[in-house]
Amino acid sequence: MSEQYDFERAWLAKFASCLDEITGKEIRKEVMKGSEELTSHSSRQDVIGWSQRAMERLDILVDGTRRREIMTSCACQYPKSELRDIREEYATTGDLDLAHRMLQNQFELFLKNSLGFGDELVEETVKRGWGTAGIKKGNTILATKIPKSGYLIEYVSETDPEIKRQYYCHCPRVREILKTSKTISPTYCYCGAGFYKGIWEEILQKPV
């Protein structure tokens, strides 16, 4: 049996586990039906079609609060190793402003060193409030997901709103839907919100 990592099976297992924990076995079985054969080798059409139907079932069977809890728990996670220094500094000082500045500095270095952004594009990105750290106002942090990093330059220069939407989405499971006239329930996109939730829960070491 191949031990190669299968992103699709891993995501589905996480989704099923969250459904079990938050809604119970019966709803989990109903929402997950039809997913048994999906793998990373499945066509995007099959993955997207199943995801649309699963979200429709989830929207019918589960209230909004629990839907958000389920989907945010399915998110891809920021590497904990890259948050260690920030977490330790916050544990020592309790200074949220300092933790936020450290995360922002880390994000700007990523833009420059990993993506090769010049100062002007970094400034434009920060001005829009995009990225890991977000904008801190009092005790609230408003984080707006950056367009998919490989397309950020194209996103900024593009004027067609439909093409901009295609550039924006990060999700490898369903982003191809944006090239079609089809839609998926907004419930699904809470998965992306969980990315930021996970960052701050790791730094603060408590639920947010």
What are these regions (language model features)?
Residues 185-194:
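Short, thiol/selenol-centered motifs that function as redox-active sites or metal-ligating centers
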Residues 204-208:
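Low-complexity, intrinsically disordered Gly/Pro/Thr-rich segments
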Residues 194-203:
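Amphipathic alpha-helical segments that form well-ordered structural scaffolds
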Residues 1-184:
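N-terminal accessory segment detector
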